[in-house]
From Swiss-Prot:
This is Elongation factor G. InterPro entries: EF-G-like_DII (IPR053905), EFG_II (IPR041095), EFG_III (IPR009022), EFG_III/V (IPR035647), EFG_IV (IPR047872), EFG_V (IPR035649), EFG_V-like (IPR000640), G_TR_CS (IPR031157). It is found in: Cytoplasm. It comes from Pelotomaculum thermopropionicum (strain DSM 13744 / JCM 10971 / SI). GO terms for biological process: ribosome disassembly. The lineage of its organism: Bacteria, Bacillati, Bacillota, Clostridia, Eubacteriales. Belongs to the TRAFAC class translation factor GTPase superfamily. Classic translation factor GTPase family. EF-G/EF-2 subfamily.
């Protein structure tokens, strides 16, 4: 099948922002103006195309990343609308990994909010070029210039206005296009008709000053343009566009636009900017990976004639077609019905059907090419972060890292009939979401589910009921504590059994040591001279990993440790993988007990917005919750307190804050890091856990 759009006419973009900045509303308008939908859906009415889950329509928030495609000015734009709520950060992380560019939406009143910072840092991590869109210019308190200042100060970016608003709040009626030096005035409510005029006289001075800044910013990153500018004092429209595109692709500049998506103003110029300034798959560096056989580095150019390579970035269960695997094609082609090699798991799989998604509607396609973002049916073992490639030319692309869950609840089925269904439902939901974990409490045998926050787990339980018809009782939220060690220690692990016939023999000497926070688990073998045959070494690793699931202090999972296998011995007849696995587990537990084990708890980054008169009371309360105040700032006549507070102290905080501030305070929090629990508190937690 011939390619419908040349690769340079393709844009893979994400729309990202803080909750309620207007991402989904902006996407709805994009779909309307590109002719993808013929009636505008509204988030507050529960009819938004991209928010297709029942929970999204009820709550007016985006939970999953919905994918869709549309066309504008001969370009195919693949859009992923991502959630803004902090509990669903994983959705943003995996979307940014496979996108080429992004539109960051900001609220003109709130400016840069906490989750805006989080998604911006995630985009920085993957080097994603982006443009900023300051939305809600029609709201009371809208301030375009403060928005730009906050992008500069709080995100450390280099924002450059390429538009100015005409009017503000109720009077917002259009934008000044600084590149073309013209004004665009919207003349109807739907925003489909607009007229282009001279810049209004009252804005002429400001527009000239901002246009000069724009030209200087563009010329700064391009010597030939700088020379031309110094000679003529001016650049043509085409030169400004080319310079802006180059600087945006190099992540040196963030072009800033404005509008009001809800009032249908400013969306078509945003579409133009997506086409003009965001990258095509051919503009980004070739993807790098590793050959799983030789370990050598591999490069895949974004071309159809290269060997096939793709990254699976999301799994979804569809009630009609079963398991859907979303993937981004980096190079080559793949036909529907053909076989593909999962190099991460060393498995060959058959692609039953390939679908192009429009939110939750699907369109079958016969073949995908480089640069496409599509979903496949029929991949049974593939999970998030796996590489799919050509079996003759294998490659493993860099995967994604996901944060550890911070909160857990016990869950039990209401009836015997729900028991079996619950296991299947939880397994499917865990496949879809890498930050959602299912485990069993070793003491009580209860099923525990862990996630990124109360809303995250609430949605999971809700989905179990709606999609899998499982009724469950849910316990009170608990903190997902972890354990780690503070010093090096070594120990022996011996497992010897002599019962008539063949016995069991495994003997290892292990050293356990602390690693940097967030660096995870690392196993190293220093066995030389075959004192332990190499086929038994992975079993020692597996035994240590298994022992880490229940730590030595209070049975919490152990994180950030290194295990080194130093020595051991084996028996010609009696040794087996099982014996070495058990020996590894015994050795790890013994070494961990000697390595000064400590309890860790999740610490949240909290931002509280209150009136000045309540400041003292709120700060005193945060201190009593073991909080550490970082800084305070004034914003829009309110006081903003930034603090780090342990999650254990934040349950019920919303109600508490409301009563302290007479309902006028609000807060946001997101996971920051794990930190050691103070000894006096750790003793109580361990006693409750062990003594029940």
């Amino acid at each position: 099948m011939a390619r419908q759009f040349p690769l340079e006419k393709t844009r893979n973009i994400g729309i990202m922002a803080h909750i309620d900045a207007g991402k989904t509303t902006t996407t709805e308008r994009i779909l309307f103006y590109t002719g993808r939908v013929h009636k505008i859906g509204e988030v507050h009415e529960g009819t938004a195309t991209m928010d297709w889950m029942a929970q999204e329509q009820e709550r007016g928030i985006t939970i999953t990343s919905a994918a869709t495609s549309c066309r504008w000015r001969d370009c195919q734009i693949n859009i992923i609308d991502t959630p803004g709520h902090v509990d669903f950060t994983v959705e943003v992380e995996r979307s940014l990994r496979v996108l080429d560019g992004a539109v960051a939406v900001f609220c003109s009143v709130g400016g840069v909010e906490p989750q805006s910072e989080t998604v911006w840092r995630q985009a920085d991590k993957y080097g994603v070029p982006r443009i900023a869109y300051i939305n809600k210019m029609d709201r009371v308190g809208a301030d375009f210039h403060r928005g730009i200042q906050m992008i500069r100060e709080r995100l450390g970016a280099n924002p450059v206005a390429i538009q100015l608003p005409i009017g503000v709040e109720d009077g917002f009626c259009g934008v000044v296009d600084l590149v073309r030096n013209r004004a665009i005035i919207y003349t109807d409510d739907l925003g489909t008709t607009s007229e282009e005029t001279e810049i209004p006289p009252e804005l002429a001075g400001e527009a000239a000053a901002f246009r000069e800044r724009l030209i200087e910013a563009v010329a700064e990153f391009d010597e030939s343009l700088m020379e031309k500018y110094l000679e003529n004092g001016e650049l043509t429209e085409e030169e400004i566009k080319e310079g802006l595109r180059r600087a945006t692709l190099a992540v040196k500049i963030v072009p800033v636009l404005c509008g009001s998506s809800f009032k249908n103003k400013g969306v078509q110029p945003l579409l133009d900017a997506i086409v003009d300034y965001l990258p095509a798959p051919t503009d980004i560096p070739a993807i790098r990976g590793v050959n799983p056989v030789s370990g050598a580095g591999e490069v895949r150019e974004a071309r159809d004639d290269e060997p096939f390579s793709a990254l699976a970035f999301k799994i979804m269960t569809d009630p009609y077609v079963g398991k859907l695997t979303f993937f981004r094609v980096y190079s080559g082609r793949l036909k529907s019905g053909s076989y593909v090699y999962n190099s991460t798991r060393n498995r060959r799989e058959r692609v039953g059907r390939i679908l192009r998604m429009h939110a939750n509607h699907r369109e079958d396609i016969e073949e995908v090419c480089a640069g496409d973002i599509v979903a496949a049916v029929g991949l049974k073992t593939t999970t998030t972060g796996d590489t799919l490639c050509d079996e003759k030319e294998p490659v493993i692309l860099e995967s994604m890292e996901f944060p550890e869950p911070v909160i857990q609840v016990a869950i039990e089925p209401k009836t015997k009939a729900d028991q079996e269904k619950m296991g299947v439902a939880l397994q499917k939901l865990a496949e879809e979401d890498p930050t959602f974990r299912v485990s069993t409490d070793p003491e009580t045998g209860q099923t525990l589910i862990s996630g990124m926050g109360e809303l995250h787990l609430e949605i999971i339980v809700d989905r179990m009921m709606r999609e899998f018809k499982v009724e469950a009782n849910v316990g009170r939220p608990q903190v997902a504590y972890k354990e780690t060690v503070r010093k090096k220690a070594r120990a022996e692990g011996k497992f010897i059994r002599q019962t008539g016939g063949r016995g069991q023999y495994g003997h290892v000497v292990l050293e356990v040591e602390p690693r940097e926070p967030g660096s995870g688990y690392l196993f190293t073998s220093k066995i030389i001279g075959g004192v332990i045959p190499k086929e038994y070494i992975p079993a020692v690793d597996a035994g240590a990993k298994e022992a880490m699931e229940n730590g030595v202090l209070a049975g919490f999972p152990v994180i950030d440790v290194g295990v080194t296998l130093l020595d051991g011995s084996y028996h010609e007849v009696d040794s087996s993988e099982m014996a070495f696995k058990i020996a590894g587990s015994i050795g790890f537990k013994d070494a961990a007990r000697r390595a000064d084990p400590v309890l860790l708890e999740p610490v949240m980054k909290v931002e509280v917005v209150v009136n000045e008169e309540y400041m003292g009371d709120v700060i005193g309360d945060l201190n009593s919750r073991r909080g550490r105040i970082e800084e305070m700032e004034a914003r829009n006549g309110m006081q903003v307190i930034h603090a780090y507070v342990p999650l254990a102290e934040m349950f019920g905080y919303a109600t508490d804050l409301r009563s302290r501030t007479q309902g006028r305070g609000n807060y946001t929090m997101q996971f920051s890091h794990y930190a050691q629990v103070p000894d006096n508190i750790a003793e109580g937690i361990i006693a409750r856990r062990v003594g029940r």
